[in-house]
Amino acid sequence: VILKDKNILLAVTGSIAIYKSLELIRLFIKAGANVKVILSDGAKKFINPITFEAISQNRVLDESSESWDKSQNYNHIDITKWADILLIAPATANTINKISCGIADNLLLQTVLACKKKIIIAPAANTNMIENPITIQSVNNLKNLGFEVLQTQTKELACKDVGNGAMLEPIDIFHKTCKELLKTSYWENRRAVLSGGGTLEKIDDVRYISNFSSGKMASSLATALYYLGADVTLVSSRGFENIPYEIDLRVSTSSQEMFENLKLALEKKFDKKSFLFMVAAVSDYIPKEKFDGKLKKEKLGETWSLELSKNIDILANLDKKDIFSIGFKAEMDKKEAKSNAQNMLKNKNLDAVCLNILDEVNSFGSDTNKIKLLLKDKSFDFYGNKLNISLEILNRFEKEFTNE
């Protein structure tokens, strides 16, 4: 429920992409938000308003339902006072060009003109219309005025042509809306670099040594950082399929590749002190020799001894000067887990360690996690959905490192 008590006003115009708006409402409500919908007359030609009312659990505002009865407060002025944000999705080229010119000849456009909150526009139009110089000029004008105009995507359009103009997927619009609603001054314009997933160390060209780390915790943490406004780079081997598209993703399979990409990512610095989250499960040992091609079992015989050598300690070898460094440690021995994490905190000169004790409930690949956050002189416990506890952990860091 990351959007608990947030009020989202969704304005829907007449586009074939309207079906995506229904999924978008579902995502917002699942995240705990309150959603109200404004429909243009064109939108109602595609989908009956009752469908939006059933999913949003709120009465639709349109030309026929607008009321100036003060007991209802359901008009284009009052509804903008209720909203925390206004999202127009889909937004046709006609609507975009009218907004740019300040035209308010229907209820939806009047609402836009009356709104003093952040406005996000998700365009949807034929390639020729979205790339028309008039539309391009309108988009640029709206951006200069402070509107957030999202990009479109290239895919098969309603006319069966493949081209630019399709509205972003609902999950991408959801991510962008979450960022606008959740970003904080502490995290905004702050660098955050993360590693994630289990490394894959090649034996030959078809076999490798790895572990069960799914990469989900790193991706959840990267997403939470993005929502809070950070400039995020995720260096990961797996589990990043649903992260926001604006996150800088650097796919890295081997520990050496991960090390090199982390070094490069940490070179980019802002005025605020950066954060490094070492979430990846890096192989402690790697094959001493990497074989070309595929080793044949006929030549290997009944037994096969594979020689391993100790791997580089990425966290110990990265330059962590002027960087908040957070280590992640997975343990199975409950008795020794905390002392092992405390040793990691001290020996690697870290600012914090997130301890994850693995058991039947808290296992690799699950969507929930139980973490003990260890600082130099205190500790905190977190349990729940990985995205939710990521936001809680980051909120704790903001409180603990508030002056830096």
Predicted region positions:
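A cross-family phosphate/adenosyl-ligand binding-site feature
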Residues: 1-120, 126-404
